[in-house]
Design a protein with these regions (language model features):
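Segments adjacent to and within acyl-thioester-processing domains across lipid
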Residues: 74-176
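Preference for bulky hydrophobic residues occupying beta-strand positions
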Residues: 36, 65, 79, 154-156, ...
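Hydrophobic, proline/glycine-rich low-complexity stretches
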Residues: 1-46, 54-58, 63, 172-205
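HotDog/MaoC-like acyl-thioester-processing domains
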Residues: 8-9, 17, 33, 42-113, ...
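Short amphipathic alpha-helical surface micro-motifs
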Residues: 14-20, 44-48, 70, 110-114, ...
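Conserved small/polar residues in nucleotide/adenosyl-binding loops
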Residues: 207-213
Length: 213
């Protein structure tokens, strides 16, 4: 239960588990695109995972993953796999780092809700070191401070190791719902679907920025 929200597995964690199953079943090791549908609640007990290969070519393969519990389909994923070790061509990912990299780290605060209510921080957050911008820390605000943009940005890591593709998938559903920075606590906001696109594996500290239009 280290990767749970209460008694429910975290959405990014489930995506990472399904991606792992897909990558082990396909001829290409890296899941460069995945689309996950969370169809029903997954309980904290045994599951089964079934993988179907839909298409295979020299440079990519496509598969479908079904997560089943109590003979009921709980989550479904389609994914495209390739191999970063053989992907060549134009690279447009070299962009200037955002201004936030130049800000002092004391302008960030640990992602921890326990000062609002003891035990309020989900267990999956405690597996990481995450510091977010203070202006996005909705749990420290009062009603007069609300109304900011629906956004959350910060730095995140799990130990000293560089995250692999599965950790990236876990991170993709990591931050609290950004609408809370605008409207305050809204209770449980479930993830109904999650799309990840991984273009290359990271080589350094990760900065993450989530926003809602």
């Amino acid at each position: 239960k280290d990767y749970f929200v209460g008694n429910t597995p975290h959405g990014g964690y489930l995506t990472a588990v399904m991606q792992k199953a897909l990558s082990l079943s396909m001829p290409h090791p890296h899941v460069i695109n995945s689309n996950t549908l969370y169809l029903d609640r997954t309980e904290p007990k045994e599951i089964s995972i079934h993988v179907d290969k839909i298409r295979e070519s020299r440079g990519s393969s496509v598969g479908r993953v079904s997560l089943i519990q109590d003979e009921k389909l709980r989550c479904m994923m389609t994914g495209i796999c390739s191999d970063f070790n053989y992907m060549n061509g134009v690279n447009d990912l070299e962009t200037l780092p955002p201004k936030i990299f130049n800000e002092k780290r004391d302008s960030f605060i640990s992602l921890n809700f326990d000062n609002k209510q003891e035990g309020f921080t989900p267990s999956f957050i405690k597996q990481t070191k995450c510091d977010i911008a203070k202006q996005h820390a909705w749990w420290l605000k009062n009603e007069n401070d609300l109304g900011d943009e629906a956004r959350c940005a910060g730095f995140i890591s799990m130990g000293e190791e560089i995250p692999d593709q599965f950790v990236l998938s876990f991170y993709s559903d990591f931050f609290p719902p950004v609408v809370m920075n605008k409207y305050g606590p809204l209770g449980w906001v479930p993830t109904l679907s999650l799309t990840t696109n991984i273009r290359q594996v990271p080589t350094c500290l990760l900065y993450t920025s989530d926003a809602a239009d």
